[in-house]
Amino acid sequence: MAKIRVISDLPVMDDSGNILHVQELAGNSNESKPTTGMANGSLYLETDTGLISVFDEDDGWGTPQ
């Protein structure tokens, strides 16, 4: 499974519809990683191509949906 590297400050929504910034998810890193305390343990990343990836705490990285 490929890791997803965030190369810009893309908008990220949790599954409650709250918009987060990449820095809040990955700190100073360029890689987006799952965080704890999110609703249902999942994050949804919408890229500039419109794809949505789901980050799950169990497998660590997301699969494009």
Question: Which role does the model predict for each range below?
Answer:
Residues 2-43, 47-51, 59-65:
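Extracellular/surface-exposed low-complexity repeats and stalk/linker segments enriched in Gly/Pro
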